[in-house]
Amino acid sequence: IWTYSLKDIREGLQDCYAGLKQDVKEKYGETLTQLAAMGFSGMMHGYMAFDKDNELLVPFRTWRNTMTEDAAKELSELLSFNIPQRWSVAHLYQAILKEEEHVKDIDYLTTLAGYVHWKLTGEKVLGVGEASGMFPIDIETKDYNQTMIKTFDDLIKDKKFGWKLENILPKVLIAGDKAGILSEEGAKLLDPSGNLEAGIPLCPPEGDAG
């Protein structure tokens, strides 16, 4: 399985920010403490499933995992819409087909960019481009396709999970929407030195299409 640990993600973020901070110090002689705005992008698709205690249920399954062929084929036929293997809903349905124990405990399902944004702001949101790699988007409403959401929920209703699909997916935002601000915890996560101040506005987390 292609994966990255939460430790890898955290340390990668910190290394990236430390590089930016050092660059500012070298060029301008100033310690970076504030930014006008910020945003995050990451590899689209994949599968990061969390329980109600915000614990990761299974290792992060990245878009590179081609292990969802059965789910992708069935969903593509059911929804009359091409669902590639890398899409989050394909990973979710494959886990259901395999009767993976963790599925019943899912409280939140997101992507890498969505996870980073959530940890830094507390907001469970995605930009519409990134969200389109989780589940089909209705171009009129700029939100998840409600007809397809219902079709999926009907497909799995006999499983009697304690969740509905839309309730575990991130809220969809478009460019310019308020997506939260950097929290105190997020600032410390990004810059363990404590120099970075909270309160910086963030744009919706996006992917290839954002």
Cite the ranges covered by each PLM segment.
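N-terminal glycine/serine-rich phosphate-binding loop of ATP-dependent small-molecule kinases
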Residues: I1-L57, K73, D105, E166-N167, ...
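Short acidic-aromatic active-site loops that bind/stabilize oxyanions
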Residues: W2-R10, F81-Q85, K171-G176, I200-P204
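Alpha-helical packing segments of well-folded alpha/beta enzyme cores
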Residues: I9-L20, H91, L112, Y144, ...
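Short beta-strand-loop/turn "lid" adjacent to the catalytic site in phosphate-handling enzymes
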Residues: V24-T62, N82-P84, H117-D138, L169-L182
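Short secondary-structure capping/junction motifs at helix and strand boundaries
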Residues: E26-L35, S80-P84, E100-L109, K157-F161
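Phosphate-binding/catalytic loop of phosphoryl-transfer enzymes
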Residues: M43, K52, L56-L57, I83-E130, ...
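Glycine-rich phosphate-binding loop plus the immediately following alpha-helix
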Residues: R64-E100, Y115, F135-T151, K157
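ATP-dependent carbohydrate kinase catalytic cores
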Residues: D138-G210
